Structure formats: C-alpha cells, structure tokens
Amino acid sequence: MPDFISAKIMKKNYKGEVFPCMGCRSFLAPWKDEEGNYKWYGRFNQGVVTINLADVGLSAEQDMEKFWNILDERLSLCREALMLRHESLKGTLSDVSPIHWQFGAIARLRPGETIDKLLEGGYSTLSLGYIGLYECVLSLLGKSHTTEDGDELAVRIMERLRGACD
C-alpha cells in the first residue's frame, strides 16, 4: 500500500519542507540543527513498540475503569521496552557499521567514537505505535469510532497515548 502525505500541509508547517515517512509509515519528530534548519534525512528511530488497543479493549470486558488501568499498565510496559532499547544502544561504537555511523548514511563519527550523542536531544527518536483503535472502541462501547461517543473515546485514548510519549 502506498504512503500518502500532504505536501501542502507539510510545506505550511515546516517552512516549505516536504519529507517522506520511513518505511513503516512512521515519521520522525521535527528536529532542527544548530543553525535552525530542519533535518529529516540521516536521522533514525532507535526502536518502536506497538500497543495492541484491541486486546486492551477486549481485556477490559466493557469496564471503562478496568480499561484505563490496563491501558496504563501496557503503556508502562511499552515505555520500559523502549527505554531498554535506548539503554542497550548506549556505548555502541561507530565501528559496528561504518557506512551508517562514519561515512554519512546517518552520521560522520570518528572510528571508535560512540553513537551516544545521537541518542539524545531529539536527533533520533523512540516510537510508540498502535493498532486496533476501531476494535478497541467497538469492544468497549459496542459502536464505531465514527459515532459521536466512539469518536470522543477514540480521541481520549489517543490523548492518553500522546501523554505517555511526552
């Protein structure tokens, strides 16, 4: 399936810049270099963890309090997994993949230099993915996320995911 982007909106939001998503339809968060220019290419995602919202919704058995508790537990697990990935990358030497870390595919580090400075400050990202929002809302409310009640719940769920990432 092709990825569709809105070049018109991107140009408006990012000072005329348009950029593609990564292979999994994941976009890097905006990041500017020391001169204030957006940098999209050469950056990377340290890892992604996907939360299965359909499973969270079904596990709650239509109990909203139980749902929010399960969701928070799963989000905590996702955060732990992402931070384990982040910590495991610390200390990685540029020598493990010179084409990436030394010759410019991602950076131009010296031989023997760690990639640590690329792991902080937004140059690279950690991502929380999700799947099954429709099924989650349907299992909790018995209605689609396209109904007024369903839309309200779907937005609250997305806000909770966003809050977990901030």
How would you label these PLM feature ranges?
Residues 126-139, 159:
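Contiguous, well-ordered alpha-helical segments that form the cores/surfaces of helical PPI scaffolds
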Residues 1-122, 139, 143-166:
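Conserved catalytic cores of very large enzyme subunits
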